[in-house]
Amino acid sequence: MKIAYFDCAAGIAGDMCLGALLDCGVPLEYLNRQLQALGIEGEYGLQVSRVQRCGQPALQAVVEVLGSQSGGSLARHWAEIQALIAGSQLSPAIKARSLAVFEKLAQAEAKVHQMPVEEVHFHEVGAVDALVDIVGTCIGLDWLQVERVLSSPHPVGGGWVSTEHGKLAVPVPAVIELWEMGRVPVFSNGVEAELVTPTGAALAVALAEEFGPCPPMRVEKVGRGAGAQELPIPNVFRLWIGEANGGELTETVSVLQTQIDDLNPQVIAYTCEQLLALGAWDVFTQPITMKQGRPGILLTVICPPDRVPECQDLIFRETTTLGIRHFQQQRTLLERVVERVETPYGLVDIKVARHHGRIVNAQPEFRDCVARAQEFHVPVQTVWLAAQSAWQNRLQG
């Protein structure tokens, strides 16, 4: 599986992403040709140059707005952006990623300006440079065949910037909204400047599956995109491209644990159900012996890091616990796909796991087996065996 890791130690912006992708080998001619599908080629020019930031070489991509738009941003409503991208000849994958980024950006700007998303039509969402940066980044990721994006935490920066709405404190409101939307971990690197732009934040929030350390991977390429400012640190966004180790996938999970010895077991069962409904990946209990020999249970919840606050709130609300331990761990997953087979009882999904490209496990989806068994009034094991047989016949056929 091809992975892209956004290294945002000095920040992230749309033009920095574009520069890093070009530095990774995305052909400029290919990028320009793909961007022509938007029908805005007469509105901008894309200039690329090799520069240095604090002695580090990087590629700087600059979108120059041409003609009547050079004095300001092109105002387009969110619906126009949707139509422009959806109606283009770009691939479905590029369209989906581009629209996801613009949707996050529009939602953030709408919240900042207290207006419906449909009415958003100001500088960020309508600007030609944002279109080129966002769609161009998605084109580049597609060319590199990136299947999964992860990101480092974001630096908060500081100071003030001038905008159409006057001077704004850094980070600007739209970036803060995007960070809140994506539960992005942030830190201070001591630099007083705008380090994360709304476009850069939207790209990370929409495309990255999680924020944290670089995952285990075999590094194939590292692209460096230069920011426009000269800073006390190298103003460079680094894009790591590589293959997940052994075809496996490693991700960060949060683990919550608490011991309980004074709660109705029926409430514990209900709490487990609610935690799963809230987005926890797994919830289980173990019998333990607590102080003074009292029998109790250890409740363990495994969830995405961004679900920790909601899961903690639910545990405090529904149980008698006075404290919850939480920590992060890495888990390794096999590459998994779902395939569908035809049985005498209807369609059943098969969950297939691969290790180093070799199938190591294939199991019928039990819920499908139950549904087909109830529909045809046969034992669930009969449907399960029929699905396994259909899968084996496909492999041998």
Curated annotation (Swiss-Prot):
Give each disulfide bond as a residue pair. none
Query: Which superkingdom does the taxonomy of this entry point to?
Result: Bacteria
Q: Which InterPro entries match?
A: Ni_insertion (IPR002822)
Q: Which GO terms describe its molecular function?
A: lyase activity; nickel cation binding
Keyword list (alphabetical) reads: Nickel
Pfam families the UniProt entry points to: Ni_insertion
UniProt key word Thylakoid: no
Into which family does the record put it?
A: Belongs to the LarC family.
Family matches, as PANTHER family: NICKEL INSERTION PROTEIN-RELATED, PYRIDINIUM-3,5-BISTHIOCARBOXYLIC ACID MONONUCLEOTIDE NICKEL INSERTION PROTEIN
Q: What is this protein called?
A: Putative nickel insertion protein
